A protein has these predicted regions:
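SDR active-site strand-loop-helix element
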Residues: 25-31, 75-77
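Mid/C-terminal beta-alpha module of Rossmann-like enzyme folds, strongest
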Residues: 121, 128-171, 176-177, 183
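NAD(P)-cofactor binding segment of oxidoreductase domains
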Residues: 1-26
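C-terminal amphipathic/interface module of NAD(P)-dependent oxidoreductases
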Residues: 176-209
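NAD(P)-dependent short-chain dehydrogenase/reductase
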Residues: 63-110, 117, 123
């Protein structure tokens, strides 16, 4: 169970070590702690009910952090993308450059979130000395198909006939909606996440130089 060794036991070890030295712990988590069977955005007070091994391991990590270090900030986000590493957005960009049909998972809905924006939010939270669980995803909800279409448009390409829906990942419910409501962020007034389309446009413009 590699997922539990990394996401649960790893988080436990870091939480324990950070408490011993009196350090605040910032723990990054995911929308996958929810099963995606609802029809509304999920806020910090909704019960986490993961339906995948990954989601269960991430929730276990959250629980260890909450139990072992009271000075914690847990940040949940969704469909995070950045220049480095593999992610859904970069996969679509690569396929778009290669031409042909772009394959995306069917009936999955959430909010693509820029790692750059997410990092800016975390820095604001550090400065504000906030604790607890916060959702931090770009505003709005879309399907993976809609996200792929928007990526193509941002690249100056016509998405018509370019997207092929394929079966959802094994072990995940379908349809699946896990877009996060940034309720605590709005209550505290600390930060305002941008609309996912605006953040996507900025990201692709930055890639294109």
């Amino acid at each position: 169970m590699k997922a539990f060794r990394v996401n649960a036991i790893g988080a436990r070890n870091v939480a324990s070590a950070s408490r011993k030295v009196g350090a605040k712990l910032i723990h990054m988590s995911t929308d996958d702690v929810f099963d995606g069977q609802g029809n509304e955005p999920l806020n910090e007070f909704d019960t986490a009910t993961p339906d995948t091994i990954f989601g269960k391991s991430k929730l276990a990590g959250e629980n260890f952090v909450r139990e072992l270090n009271p000075k914690h900030l847990i940040v949940r986000s969704s469909w995070v993308y950045a220049k480095e590493g593999s992610c859904f957005v970069n996969s679509v960009i690569r396929q778009a450059k290669e031409g042909g049909v772009i394959q995306v998972a069917a009936e999955q809905y959430s909010s693509p979130t820029s790692a750059k924006v997410l990092a800016d939010f975390v820095m604001k939270m550090i400065d504000a000395n906030e604790y607890g669980i916060y959702h931090a995803s770009c505003e709005g909800c879309c399907s993976r198909v809609e996200a792929a279409e928007e990526i193509l448009r941002c690249m100056g390409q016509d998405p018509t006939g370019r997207i092929e829906e394929i079966s959802a990942e094994a072990g995940k419910n379908s349809p699946r909606r896990t877009d996060l409501q940034n309720l605590m962020m709005k209550v505290t007034g600390i930060y305002q996440m941008p609309d996912w389309k605006d953040a996507m446009r900025d990201y692709i413009q930055e890639l294109r130089g």
